[in-house]
């Protein structure tokens, strides 16, 4: 479960960038597990300012104070308190990349955003400034400061587009410079209608880095394919990532198996060391059984009526008329099939968006790490709760006999509570 300030920033930013190219697999496999007790209290003091204070206990008491200001208007329609928030908005879950998801999404325009956070008792500071010059270009400045002379400043110049994304990065840490890009290969809409195939597209992204102080380069590229099932309308995503310098190859398959579940499998392989790993992850959503949304009825498919002899009504030849009637019947069935596929996709995503979920279970495991990660996110009486653990496998020797026993013990265990007004 993401924090409140990240939820506010996420509502203002686009996820059409290289960083979110493999978001679906990361959300199902590498989700964050709390390792201590943490309580976070947030509120919206003015229409443009947000405040957060949190306290955590991990052997010692730690905490932080966060402040955010933005000149965005109309955030009341997007930012909800913990009692009215949609749990799908604050949980890192399967990311729908296809175009039909933007059913009820609203765009909020803003020119600047200021974010600051101070940790205590160590007094670490972190901040961020986002300044938009145009609708598609912005500059992001992030910095981290502490008393042990650890001061890092990183600047980003980002340019967004419907199909393209470009980003230049400069950091004071080893004078690191980087360039990241993303291009979406979207098929042109059909002249007849928007069909299933217009919701399938390929995304290609890459990143190039160079540490000027040590002259250490690195690069990576990622390919993503998104589509829907023709019969059920459920989305699925395939990614392939490759780092040529380290020889790391990673492939993922993520699918929304139903409106209440998602599954992901990832296979990693190194070309140089021949090491491999297989990771599995899934999430199970629970719907509120007391509150049923009446408006979740499936929309009726729109049938396109093609009149007989549509292409030629002036032919006097009986044989030619029979051929034209066969052509009309063929095109009519194709149009109905196109509309049926589109209706199935739109109905699935509309039904998913309108469902009232109360909690979600997440599970992930890895053959190489031999662990089991469990996370539960949910709502209870206006509070947002997140509890999880990571079980790892260890071998212990039995004193009575020399046989080794396999045991599992929790390497991480924690509980996080959030409340916002």
UniProtKB/Swiss-Prot annotation:
InterPro entries: Mdm10
Mode of membrane association: Multi-pass membrane protein
Compartment list: Mitochondrion outer membrane
Residues spanning the signal sequence: none
Domain of life: Eukaryota
Protein keywords: Membrane, Mitochondrion, Mitochondrion outer membrane, Transmembrane, Transmembrane beta strand
Any matching Pfam family: MDM10
Cellular component GO terms, alphabetical: ERMES complex; SAM complex
GO biological processes: establishment of mitochondrion localization; mitochondrial genome maintenance; mitochondrial outer membrane translocase complex assembly; mitochondrion-endoplasmic reticulum membrane tethering; peroxisome organization; phospholipid transport; protein insertion into mitochondrial outer membrane
Assembly, per entry: Component of the ER-mitochondria encounter structure (ERMES) or MDM complex, composed of MMM1, MDM10, MDM12 and MDM34. Associates with the mitochondrial outer membrane sorting assembly machinery SAM(core) complex.
HAMAP family: Mdm10
Domain notes: Lacks alpha-helical transmembrane segments, suggesting that it resides in the membrane via beta-sheet conformations similar to those predicted for other outer membrane proteins and porin.
Name listed for the protein in its UniProt record: Mitochondrial distribution and morphology protein 10
Species whose genome carries this gene: Vanderwaltozyma polyspora (strain ATCC 22028 / DSM 70294 / BCRC 21397 / CBS 2163 / NBRC 10782 / NRRL Y-8283 / UCD 57-17) (Kluyveromyces polysporus)
